[in-house]
A protein has these predicted regions:
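A short helix->beta-strand "capping" segment at the edge of beta-propeller domains
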Residues: 90-114
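Beta-rich, blade/repeat-based domains predominating
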Residues: 112-124, 158-181, 192, 225-241, ...
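Conserved beta-strand positions in repeat-built beta-propeller and related beta-rich domains
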Residues: 123, 130-135, 197-203, 247-252, ...
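Generic structural signal for coil-to-beta-strand starts
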Residues: 127-128, 180, 196, 244-245, ...
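A short loop-to-beta-strand structural motif that recurs across blades of beta-propeller domains
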Residues: 138-140, 206-209, 255-257, 315-318, ...
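Short loop/turn segments that connect beta-strands within beta-propeller blades
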Residues: 143-147, 211-215, 260-265, 321-325, ...
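Blade-level signature of beta-propeller repeat domains, shared across WD40, Kelch, NHL, RCC1
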Residues: 475-512
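Long beta-sheet-rich domains in secretory-pathway and surface-associated proteins
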Residues: 511-624
Length: 624
């Protein structure tokens, strides 16, 4: 099914992709341009709605649906009503209430109202966090040591500052820790700390650099464009500090762009070269539906990895060898046809990739072609305004029985977005629709998810306020769209695009409980037969004092794109309990694969959650 929203400015379409991210792939991945030739391509969107439409049954009368209709008029009606609607949708509530923080995450409201922060990067040498306001057009910094906002620098030529209903997305922001030779000398003398700041600019189809030594900006024009959308939509940027080069890609350009820092000149395209990505594997698909996801630079093998997709149809991973100047192409299976975020592991042996429009992330071994899928926990009921975790089966602890599931759609996905490698080899990714930050440790296959305190009802399928069916007054998501890892301070910093906040996740805080699976790491189960798995939850002696909420047992699996069990069943002997009076609790998880489940290898995620975190372990499952 396709839906067409016409007469919407291209940049405003990002709103649509976030309000209904199941029907519309995140950052502008799924826009086609055409409706009988009557609508200009840059004002037309073709939205691909597949079987994984998040809460489609609930959205018709939702408040978000009303906001969507109003938002479609934003760029053509600069009226008081349009401005008010824009501010309600994108500007957050501008409060500094402590309720928007917990023992793991602290959120900070930005110095100005309605900044719409997106790109963010930790400057480890300067002990700062840098971010860009996509609305105000400022580059801001936050002092990590002093825990306060430092300074905001005005970016020149940022037209959205003057237009009350406009913005320009800055998806990627990086710190060049090496900088120029002059800058290195200044660092040695203590005159300046940290390297120059690089970031993308969608609307001006450009790359910016902020030079710390002179506190000035330079802009470099991308020497190419999209005839359909008016911008390459630069979305992912990497820096090679040894060769003084930057690499970047644009959503609407099948190209790898390489910038030679020694030759790039302010206000021009000089020093930027274009490498065309071979797209023959996408033959038969409208080129406007073929988009570039992101890149990852592999310094050990001097290569650039690129994800490319036609959402729901075809996905490929490319490796560009910078020495040989050649591409190697890796075809992906149909169920992983939407690769987005890409990260290279510590040994440069595996890629870790997020799959757009699902709850899936996976490991790809380029040498063998072997793929191992993992899945997040299922979308929390809190996203939909439900405080109580209720699953089918009349409260008997059943996780999935193919029947009713309260007001939670089986098709609700968490949307793992970007993915980054930490210094210890673990992987971080943001669950944009799940409203969580997640850490996965490949060494022990442990997934830890941290709940984002802020929720915005305008960005979710929420029940009416005052509903007496057990629904909560809090609902929705915070739109965590980008993040950066601080290796020095064991912190992860992230932006909340529609909430006017940046957040800090303190990874040093102890988890309130641990989860141990008694069974071996790999199980074989026959279809139609049940298998018991012992799970032990132990309270941490060093758990934070605030972590005293009830424990909920949770499970998910790679049987479906959302982590749902489909027609298979799984239930806990006890699903909800308190750890206030006991040090540990053992429960049994019983799993029975359905007879119609295809034989093969799957991943079962079993764990527990409280109000703040989810703690899961992965078990390999062979279904025969």
């Amino acid at each position: 099914m396709f839906k067409i929203f016409s007469s919407i400015c291209l940049l405003t379409l990002i709103l649509v992709s976030l309000v209904f991210p199941t029907s519309i792939l995140l950052p502008l991945q799924q826009y086609a341009a055409a409706e009988e030739g009557l609508i200009q391509k840059t004002h037309t969107m073709l939205v691909h709605s597949n079987t994984n439409d998040n809460l489609a049954n609930n959205k018709k009368n939702s408040q978000a649906d009303i906001k969507l209709r109003n938002a479609s008029l934003i760029t053509t009606q600069s009226t008081t009503a349009a401005v008010k609607n824009f501010q309600e949708t994108f500007c957050g509530d501008n409060t500094t209430a402590t309720s928007y923080s917990n023992g793991y995450i602290r959120e900070n409201t930005l110095p100005q109202s309605c900044e719409m922060p997106l790109g963010i990067a930790v400057d480890n040498n300067a002990h700062k966090v840098w971010y860009v306001s996509t609305k105000k057009g400022v580059l801001g910094s936050y002092d990590i040591k002093q825990n306060k906002f430092d300074q905001e620098y005005i970016i020149p030529n940022w037209n959205s500052r003057e237009n009350p209903v406009d913005y320009s997305q800055v998806w990627s922001l990086k710190v060049d820790d090496s900088g120029s030779r002059k800058h290195q000398q200044q660092q040695q003398r203590g005159e300046v700390r940290g390297g120059d700041i690089w970031f993308t600019d969608v609307k001006q189809n450009a790359i910016w650099k902020f030079i710390k030594s002179s506190q000035s900006f330079e802009v470099y024009k991308i020497p190419g464009n999209s005839s359909s959308f008016g911008t390459t939509y630069p979305i992912s940027l990497e820096i090679d500090r040894k060769s003084n080069r930057i690499f970047f890609v644009g959503t609407f350009s099948a190209s790898l762009w390489i910038g030679d820092m020694t030759k790039m000149k302010n206000g021009t395209s000089e020093g930027i070269s274009q490498i065309h990505i071979p797209t023959s594997g996408f033959n038969g698909i409208d080129p406007v539906l073929i988009t570039t996801g992101s890149i990852a630079f592999d310094s050990k093998k001097n290569s650039v990895w690129i994800s490319m997709l036609s959402y729901g149809r075809k996905g490929e991973i490319f490796r560009y060898d910078l020495d040989k100047k050649s591409f190697e192409i890796f075809d992906l299976p149909r169920d992983l046809s939407s690769p987005l975020g890409v990260a290279v592991d510590s040994n440069s042996e595996n890629l870790w990739i997020t799959n757009a429009g699902t709850s899936i992330f996976y490991k790809l071994n380029p040498d063998s072609g072997n793929i191992i899928k993992f899945v997040t926990s299922k979308t929390s009921p809190k996203v939909f305004g439900d405080d109580v975790i209720t699953h089918g089966g009349g409260g008997n602890g059943q996780v999935r029985d193919g029947g009713n599931e309260s007001n939670i759609s089986k098709n609700a996905y968490t949307l793992p977005y970007w993915i980054q490698k930490d210094a210890d080899g673990s992987l971080w990714f943001n669950e944009q629709e799940g409203n969580k930050m997640a850490r996965f440790d490949p060494s022990n296959m442990k997934l830890t998810e941290y709940w984002i305190p802020t929720q915005n009802r305008l960005w979710g399928n929420c029940p009416p306020r005052g509903n007496n069916n057990g629904s909560s007054q809090t609902c929705g998501i915070a739109n965590v769209l980008q993040f950066s890892i601080s290796h020095n301070n064991q912190q992860v910093w992230f932006t909340e695009w529609s909430e006017n906040k940046i957040g800090k996740l303190d990874t040093k805080s102890h988890l309130p409980f641990s989860v141990v699976i008694a069974s071996q790491k790999e199980l074989t189960v026959k279809r139609g037969e049940s298998r018991d798995i012992k799970v032990k939850v132990t309270a941490s002696q060093s758990a934070p004092s605030f972590a005293k909420s009830n424990i909920h047992m949770i499970a998910s699996g790679t049987f479906t794109p959302t982590g749902d069990f489909g027609n298979s069943t799984g239930y806990f002997s006890q699903e909800i309990f308190s750890m206030s009076d006991v040090k540990s609790k053992q429960v049994t998880f019983t799993f029975r694969p359905s007879m119609d489940l295809n034989p093969g290898k799957y991943m079962l995620m079993i764990g527990a959650e409280d109000e703040y975190i989810s703690n899961l372990r992965a078990i390999k499952l062979n279904v025969i």
